[in-house]
């Protein structure tokens, strides 16, 4: 009787563990990643003293937000000549981060000051300032809303009028 019980138990364990089927499964072939190629179409001059944190191309100019303690600016860069023109200077205590353009305004994040600045594109004057929790990193738009990253796994969708 004991022999029968032990054979029965062994058989049940074999079936429960998949028996020969578990060994019959073959691992899937590794997926080969798709390889992309690229070609550099042109190279443009750029000041090596500008620590780029945000870029956007619009109306023939490259808009650049730079980050540097005490020296963060938003500037335009003419890609043909390499000439830059300062559009706005951030307060000394702010480290500039991501920028984006929307509806005649330029939005800029700060890294750890918890502030976003909004400038009028025609005059360069600051027209609004918003506060937000956490750090500011990247900023973009879909033409209606703003999308902000803060260095975490989250992307935040924001109303440009309220920054909420």
Language model region names:
Residues 15-16:
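C-terminal motif of bacterial Sec signal peptides marking the signal peptidase cleavage site
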Residues 29-48, 79-83:
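A short helix->beta-strand "capping" segment at the edge of beta-propeller domains
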Residues 40-45, 83-89, 125-130, 164:
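A short beta-strand motif characteristic of beta-propeller blades
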Residues 48-59, 92-103, 132-149:
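Beta-rich, blade/repeat-based domains predominating
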Residues 64-68, 106-113, 148-152:
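Conserved beta-strand positions in repeat-built beta-propeller and related beta-rich domains
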Residues 71-74, 115-116, 154-156:
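Structural signal for beta-propeller blades
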Residues 78-82, 120-124, 160-163:
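Short loop/turn segments that connect beta-strands within beta-propeller blades
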């Amino acid at each position: 009787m004991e022999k029968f019980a032990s054979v029965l138990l062994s058989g049940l364990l074999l079936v429960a563990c998949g028996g020969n089927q578990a060994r019959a499964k073959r691992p899937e072939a590794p997926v080969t990643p798709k390889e992309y190629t690229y070609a550099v179409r042109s190279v443009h001059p750029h000041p090596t003293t500008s620590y780029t944190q945000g870029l956007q191309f619009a109306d023939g100019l490259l808009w650049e937000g730079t980050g540097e303690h005490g020296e963060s600016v938003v500037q335009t860069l003419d890609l043909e000549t390499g000439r830059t023109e300062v559009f706005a200077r951030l307060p000394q205590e702010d480290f500039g981060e991501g920028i984006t353009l929307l509806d005649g305004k330029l939005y800029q994040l700060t890294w750890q000051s918890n502030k976003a600045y909004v400038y009028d594109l025609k005059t360069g004057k600051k027209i609004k300032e918003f506060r937000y929790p956490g750090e500011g990193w990247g900023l973009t738009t879909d033409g209606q809303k703003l999308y902000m990253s803060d260095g975490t796994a989250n992307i935040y969708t924001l109303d440009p009028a309220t920054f909420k």
